[in-house]
Amino acid sequence: LMDTVQRRTFLYFWEGAEPNSGLAPERYHVDGVYPQNDANVVTSGGSGFGIMAILAGIDRGYVTREEGLARMERIVSFLEKADRFHGAYPHWWYGDTGKVKPFGQKDNGGDLVETAFLIQGLLAVHQYYINGNEKEKALAQRIDQIWRDVDWNWYRKGGQNVLYWHWSPTYGWEMDFPIHGYNECMIMYILAAASPTHGVPAAVYHDGWAQNGAIVSPHKVEGIELHLRYQGT
C-alpha cells in the first residue's frame, strides 16, 4: 500500500505537470475539460510539495537521477523568470508565461505562505544535489539564490513583529492578513528566521506567531481537547 501511494503521488506531479514550467497544476480534470480555461494555471505551494515527491521518486528509482535533474532544471528556470514580489511568489501563475494569475480580486501579488511551501521544497532539492556532480551543484546554487531573494522582512508591513500573508503591487496591504499561530503556516516563520539575507528578529516569532505565549490556550472542539489556539477561533 505504501509503495502504491508513493508511486501514484509521484506520478501526479511527474506526469501531470504543466509542460512549460514543470510545476504542479492547480487542478487536474481527468476528462480534459476545463470550463474556466485554466488547464495551464500552476500553484506555487503545491509545487513545493510536488518537488519533494519527485525527490522521493528519484530515490525510489521511478525515474533516473538524470531525468529528475532535468525536471528540476526546468522548474528552476521557470521560477527565475516568473513573477515575484519582493522575492515572494504569488499563489498562482500561468504556466506558459510565468505571469501572476490572481487568486482573488486583491490577491495578485506575493503570497508569503505559499512561497514558504515552495521554498521548503526547493531547499530539499538544494540539499539533495549540493554534493553531486557539477550540473547538480550548479542547480543547487541557483536554488540558493532564489532562497536568498525572498524578502521576509518586507512582509512585516513596515517593521511590525508579525508576518503578513499577502502584498499586492496594486492593492498594497489591503488583504490585511497578519498570521498568528497555530496553523499550517509555521514553516513561514521558521524560514523567515533562518534566512541568510532577510532574516527576521526573534520578536517576530515570539510576538507574531506565539503571541507572547497566548498561543497556548487549552480548549475543546466537539469534545476533542486541543492545547494550542488556532487562528480564527
Where would I find each of the regions flagged by the language model?
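Ser/Thr/Asn(+Pro)-rich, low-complexity disordered segments
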Residues: 1-233
